[in-house]
From Swiss-Prot:
It comes from the Bacteria. This is Serine hydroxymethyltransferase. The record marks 225 as: Plays an important role in substrate specificity. Homodimer. The keyword Nucleotide-binding does not apply. One of its GO terms (cellular component) is cytosol.
Amino acid sequence: MDHLKRQDEKVFAAIEAELGRQRSKIELIASENFVSEAVMEAQGSVLTNKYAEGYPGKRYYGGCEHVDVVEDIARDRVKEIFGAEHVNVQPHSGAQANMAVYFTILEQGDTVLGMNLSHGGHLTHGSPVNFSGVQYNFVEYGVDADSHRINYDDVLAKAKEHKPKLIVAGASAYPRVIDFKRFREIADEVGAYLMVDMAHIAGLVAAGLHPNPVPHAHFVTTTTHKTLRGPRGGMILCEEKFAKQIDKSIFPGIQGGPLMHVIAAKAVAFGETLQEDFKTYAQNIINNANRLAEGLQKEGLTLVSGGTDNHLILIDVRNLEITGKVAEHVLDEVGITVNKNTIPFETASPFVTSGVRIGTAAVTSRGFGLEEMDEIASLIAYTLKNHENEAALEEARKRVEALTSKFSMYPNL
């Protein structure tokens, strides 16, 4: 980044500092990952200069013949990965992908069934502080009080009672497999559409390690980062009969010109997803998550639902007599990055919380394996149990440094 260094030392310094943070800390935020240098090169390309309102073959600007190729590559690769009939890769985020689906089939005030945020849902699944909860009448379903797993009988009962126009499946903090076939059966029984938000598990679905929602849902939304290991962005997969409506909802509905440099980066990431070694990577994500969960439980920590089926683990820290906020802070102090998170039947403020959410996608990209998961489990437990002991925290910092020093990060940057 020689040009940037000469042009703007302040921005360059901030980027260099962030690179140092990523190299020196253990990244366990479940929604984060490390993209390839090829993805970064595509996103930093001259495509950032091009306006391309519209879609391939039907643009409102001239000179789009090359970006048309890029967008077609991205769409075709997604169709191949997931078996989708239609794909829109223009959403700038997962939230905008969800918004576009809502705008396609809902009217203001329509009833929607979505997962409670503290039970694992997402802001865009009906939170009252989000546009979704303001514009529409969301009814919440959740998890069983004992198993912390989705109670499908309860979902059916609520669907029969409230007759939603749309049912939203998918989550941002649910560590178990979701039965999309069952959700579609429930939707069909009450005459509702089904939308699946697979943002967190898309990479696992792509690798065949989690049930694919595409054959069951009318609409599937996702981010393109997280387990897909692409640039930050979103996309929509749907049945062909909804293609024109979905495309109109994105443009001109809620967006103007697409970010063609980001779409190029998405295309590159999708190409990586189609490679055989991506399946190995995704399997390692799950293996690492299972090993980490086992290690945490051996250390006496409480896990929501008792474990994980995917990349995500939710730790209930109440038995340690600390809050999620304190846990996040003290772990960051020793070099482990996590996020505080609400847990099912939460009683604390969302700014405080009773839980911590972690995931294994990023550390797996870095090359961490089962032995490293054992050490991370030990480190997390040691740090949280000794959160007021500065000598213990200094020891944890040294252990984190010893671990991260074994795995290089972006050596060419």
